[in-house]
Amino acid sequence: MILLKAQSIEAMETAVEYLENINQSLPSIINEYRNQNICDVSEKMVELSDGLRWLYDVAKLTKNYHSINEDEMLGCYAEIVDAMEMKDYLLLSDLLEYELLPLTENWKAMLIDSVKSIATN
């Protein structure tokens, strides 16, 4: 049980670092979509998509230690994928700015609080 707890803390700390990277890179991704620089931003979106899937997996595996709503995460991801498939880059940039960015900031805060709480117990 102690090993599982330590692994969960490590996974959540890594997720916090990744969320910080997402929060720093999202504004440039949003601007590139708004400026129709689709070729330039495509690789970044693939990396972001992979990262969001990884975050979802971490959230599910560590759900006993935090209050992140995985369904909310999955719903946001599905909307982003739909916008990408429709090639609606204005919608995509809005989803990234007004849906994903606030969610990632919230998830980061929740994970930080969870790690602190677990570490003191």
What residues fall within each predicted segment?
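C-terminal-biased regions
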Residues: M1-N121
